[in-house]
Amino acid sequence: MVLARPDAVFAPARNRCHVSLPVNAMSLKMKVCNHVIMRHHHMHGRRYGRPGGWQQAQQPDASGAAEWFAGRLPEDWFDGDPTVIVDREEITVIGKLPGLESPEEESAARASGRVSRFRDETRPERMTIADEAQNRYGRKVSWGVEVGGERILFTHIAVPVMTRLKQPERQVLDTLVDAGVARSRSDALAWSVKLVGEHTEEWLAKLRTAMSAVDDLRAQGPDLPA
């Protein structure tokens, strides 16, 4: 029979960490308990976002996406190479549908019918190409077409954007909602961003080019002497 040590008084099973130990074993007990606490905090502690900011080095390089789609898409889908727009979450591919000999004679209803036909007939192959592109570039793929001078986007992703607005900024959104321009603050914010983008496209394009150059330099790293 194994007898318990006379200097050890055990607590109930549900509270086994609270054990009376001799002085020479107390330091070991403290180390074990601290290790368990630190391990629990590490496993379940809060993590704030991902490291770093917006860097292309954290995602697959998509600088060649336009050329890849131009070579991958069937040649009879579009009139010329498609327009490929890339951001952190999504790649949007927009191609111009082959037009009629007299585009000015095409009615809006006929153009809409051609868009619907293209969308239905190409859906399986577009899904396959989108999967390939997602594996290659780490981004979702959306589609759109141009017909009769109008750009039509198919279903594409909506990414939530967390932000904090002060009262004057919230009042701007509430005014747009109250005036019926938008249904909610979220819609009003999206409308405002779209409006700014339309009126500052040239400046935004220059800014994106500059940011892309900075990201390329960051990914390349410095040239250190041998």
From Swiss-Prot:
Species this protein is from: Mycobacterium tuberculosis (strain ATCC 25618 / H37Rv)
One cellular component (GO) term of this entry: peptidoglycan-based cell wall
Protein name, as recorded: Uncharacterized protein Rv1265
Domain of life of the organism encoding this protein: Bacteria
